[in-house]
Amino acid sequence: TLSYSSAMLGLCLNNIGLPVVITASDYVPDDKRSNALINFKACVDLILQSENGVYTVYKNKTDKYARIFIPTRLCEADRINDVFTSCDDLPPVYINEKGMISGDLLSDDTKHDMMPGLSDIDFRKSVLLVHPYPSLEYKSITIPENAGAVLHITYHSGTVSEKALFLLERCRERGLPMFLCSLKSNNNSIYETSDILLKNGAIPVFDTGNESAYAKLLLAVNLYPDDIAGFMRKNIYHEII
């Protein structure tokens, strides 16, 4: 859940004027194999050097030092090797055991649309997240009664089954928007299957990781139900690459 938590906190806490650092561990802290203490120390070192902004810190077993991630670009860990990655192509930034940072962090003054001050968020509405796989039976999908939108992930190439039209029609009957994620804005040719869905009313989410798209849509349906698509187009905290 680190990637989803990071995305939500990055979107919500980027304007509080303090550094916020999120982390986790691969094992419980008292396990000798755990990276908990390494991650925690790296978080403290980063806080001492950062004026504000939200970051995620985690040491992968494949890295020498803890890595500093942009929280809204963190991808879910590889389930076999437990390795976290970023969905951008920027050079990785690390923080060593002495607190020295190698690489450049994204400046917090990078142009983005700030979230309004949030004292309380009531997540009364949910978002149905659909991860496709070959032979997925769309008729078996139940849209929750409290759903405010549906987010359908596309395959890596931006394709999706034509059977998703059935789900899109059910969304239309319920008055719910259906968004397509994992689409690239610089792709001059959208595959026919995705194009069919878009021409029938699906809304594209360009250049955004799945986790951030989900967290952002969850905020949109609960905070801005009258302008969900407009909110999804805003770049709140570096989530649009």
What are these regions (language model features)?
Residues 1-138, 145-241:
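Active-site histidine-anchored catalytic micro-motif
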